């Protein structure tokens, strides 16, 4: 028996039926957001429909924008039922269904409730399967400059190191922190450090924030690291020795990350560190109340365990000397350890210190005396760290002087809030004019500022208000307006106007063959995660330079196919972010004990279960259209 599926009669029947569908569809293709991406256009081209003879039927269904993620225009709906099946059968949420009767039939929620009240989890499977623009992203990805993956899973795309955030969050939600930390360690050797001090750009992009509050991704990373069972080591691999040697200058996050991956690739790696303890700015720039030293020491020990040698108290002054040690490549991860001067009269007075020096002295256990009243000049994270450190050193009154408003303050909002809770005062729109030393006290003359048009940084430029000068008295003044690298002239490297090392951004190679540079020495003061990303890139480039493949990727936990079934959870849209438990302010300022205490298992699981699991949308296989049906 032969079954014919493309006879002239069947072709005409398809056109007739398709005309019935299009009769109720608005004729606004040219202005539709899905123009040239609409399946109706593709089918019309495939079946050869050239005109519509039936009179149009104008439906007057409402257009709903009751959520921040997508738009619902049921005038464009063809009642194919894909979205309903995706919600009910693929996800198990049952937030939408067919409602109404006859010509009033449409897709909606029970009792016309909002999506949030109907149990929707905003996974956007419905949007992915919709053939028209009836359900469409508020801003379709093709109207952005992003790839679909970056648009759909912005948290993963925002991570400089490329950590698979949805995957490890899912493992935490399932009560498997060992697998979660394995996923994190596939990209970084410092999960515990990042779980405490990462600037979390992923959270800034988290789509859940558009609903209520972002997932506490950093806290979940810390939970996974704190519950590391070490099983990831079973899948960790070491390459055979290559006979090549790499010298790394600086044991900060960039240097140690590069060292870790290069050692695993079989190279002999020696890290040269000028300080008496390893860790760079992780040790001497971040106070212990934010990053306990035992956490840092434990993760550095893992790096040493793969064969990395760290030589302390060795300040490298010459590249020529390094070459003579027998290395085949050099990576400069010098950090940014020099504080920037205030540029005002009197800053050389006794009692004035830059925050980089202060934090280094405190971190290395050296004696520091600040007195009872301390001023901190600046508005970044270093200024906040210096102010909170001053409290812990016994200061009774700590005042931050910042020339812009709080809205322009570059410091982390949560760190600023914690400083205020601890009793730090902040004078906004205030700038220092000069410092004088009188009667064993520092007189800090300040002037009030107002904000004008934005400057090159994008922030509104502060300008002084004439006649608004006033004077404050302090025992110490801490300058915290920035820091920069110290690049020895003997290195003979090309540098920028900001005194950072000039490199090829694609490879991090310098003007000298075989010499690479990264981290704060190249970017200027940045974050731990950005430095780690630079260390990864350097390891890749150096391995290729030494004849390797440059493949530093690892699979520490076997890949699995995520379960598309989400199930129904009443009130999901309203689940609030779990607050990080912490020491009371009065208790914390008496020591350098860690302030944040970490989530327990129940808190971590609940917080992880708040995830929208945006990545599941990418698991839906794109529709394969018939040959010759592309509307474009």
Predicted regions and their residues:
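Fe-S ferredoxin-like electron-transfer domains
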Residues: 1-270, 274-275, 282-289, 300, ...
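Mid-to-C-terminal Rossmann-like scaffold of FAD/NAD(P)H-dependent oxidoreductases
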Residues: 147, 151-155, 417-423, 431-438, ...
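Glycine-rich dinucleotide-binding loop and its adjacent helix/turn
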Residues: 223-240, 298-315, 339-393, 496-511
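Rossmann-like dinucleotide-binding cores of NAD(P)H-dependent redox enzymes
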Residues: 268-271, 275-311, 362, 387-434, ...
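Glycine-rich Rossmann-fold phosphate-binding loop(s) that bind the pyrophosphate
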Residues: 249-254, 379-380, 520
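Feature captures the FAD/FMN-dependent oxidoreductase FAD-binding
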Residues: 179, 240, 245-249, 297-344, ...
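Conserved hydrophobic helix-helix packing surfaces used for dimerization/oligomerization
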Residues: 246-248, 269, 374, 398, ...
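FAD-site-proximal beta/loop scaffold in flavoenzymes
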Residues: 348-372, 454-525, 529-533, 540, ...
């Amino acid at each position: 028996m032969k079954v014919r599926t493309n006879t002239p009669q069947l072709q005409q029947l398809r056109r007739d039926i398709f005309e019935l569908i299009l009769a109720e569809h608005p004729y606004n293709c040219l202005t539709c957001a899905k123009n040239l991406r609409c399946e109706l256009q593709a089918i019309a081209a495939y079946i050869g429909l050239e005109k519509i003879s039936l009179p149009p039927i104008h439906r007057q269904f409402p257009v709903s924008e009751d959520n921040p993620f997508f738009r619902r225009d049921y005038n464009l709906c063809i009642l194919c039922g894909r979205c309903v099946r995706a919600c009910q059968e693929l996800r198990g949420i049952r937030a939408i269904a067919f409602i109404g009767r006859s010509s009033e039939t449409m897709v909606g929620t029970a009792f016309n409730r909002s999506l949030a009240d109907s149990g929707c989890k905003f996974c956007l499977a419905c949007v992915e399967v919709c053939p028209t623009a009836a359900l469409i992203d508020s801003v379709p990805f093709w109207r952005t400059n992003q790839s679909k993956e970056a648009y759909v899973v912005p948290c993963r795309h925002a991570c400089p190191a490329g950590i698979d955030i949805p995957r490890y969050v899912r493992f935490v939600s399932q009560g498997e922190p060992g697998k979660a930390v394995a996923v994190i360690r596939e990209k970084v050797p410092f999960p515990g450090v990042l779980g405490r001090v990462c600037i979390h750009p992923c959270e800034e992009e988290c789509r859940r924030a558009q609903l209520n509050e972002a997932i506490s991704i950093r806290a979940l990373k810390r939970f996974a690291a704190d519950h590391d069972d070490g099983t990831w080591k079973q899948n960790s691999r070491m390459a055979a020795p290559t006979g090549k040697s790499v010298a790394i200058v600086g044991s900060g996050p960039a240097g140690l990350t590069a060292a870790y991956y290069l050692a695993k690739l079989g190279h002999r790696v020696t890290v040269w560190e000028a300080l008496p303890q390893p860790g760079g700015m992780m040790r001497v720039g971040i106070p212990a109340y934010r990053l306990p030293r035992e956490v840092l020491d434990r993760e550095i020990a893992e790096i040493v365990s793969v064969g990395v040698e760290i030589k302390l108290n060795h300040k490298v002054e010459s590249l020529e000397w390094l070459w003579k040690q027998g290395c085949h490549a050099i990576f400069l991860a010098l950090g940014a350890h020099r504080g920037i001067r205030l540029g005002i009269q009197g800053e050389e007075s006794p009692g004035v210190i830059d925050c980089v020096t202060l934090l280094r002295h405190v971190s290395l256990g050296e004696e520091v005396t600040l007195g009872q009243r301390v001023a901190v000049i600046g508005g970044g994270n270093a200024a906040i760290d210096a102010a909170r450190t001053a409290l812990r050193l016994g200061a009774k009154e700590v005042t931050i002087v910042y020339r812009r408003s709080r809205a322009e303050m570059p410091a982390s909002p949560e760190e600023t809030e914690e400083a205020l809770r601890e009793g730090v005062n902040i004078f906004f729109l205030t700038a220092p004019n000069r410092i004088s030393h009188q009667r064993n006290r520092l007189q800090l003359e300040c002037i009030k500022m107002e904000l004008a048009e934005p400057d090159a940084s994008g922030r509104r430029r502060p300008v002084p208000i004439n006649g608004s000068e006033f004077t404050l008295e302090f025992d110490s003044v801490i300058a915290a307006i920035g820091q920069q690298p110290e690049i020895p002239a003997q290195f003979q490297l090309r540098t920028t106007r900001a005194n950072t090392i000039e490199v090829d951004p694609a490879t991090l190679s310098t003007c000298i063959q075989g010499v690479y540079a990264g981290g704060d020495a190249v970017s200027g003061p940045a974050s731990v995660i950005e430095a780690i990303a630079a260390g990864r890139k350097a390891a890749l480039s150096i391995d290729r330079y030494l004849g390797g493949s440059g493949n530093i990727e690892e699979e520490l936990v076997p890949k699995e196919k995520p379960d598309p079934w989400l199930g129904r959870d009443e009130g999901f849209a309203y689940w609030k972010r779990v607050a990080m438990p912490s020491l009371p302010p009065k208790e914390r300022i008496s020591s350098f004990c860690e302030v944040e205490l970490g989530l327990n298992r129940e808190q971590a699981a609940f917080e992880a279960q708040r995830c929208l699991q945006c990545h599941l949308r990418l698991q839906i296989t794109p529709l394969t259209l018939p040959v010759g049906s592309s509307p474009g």
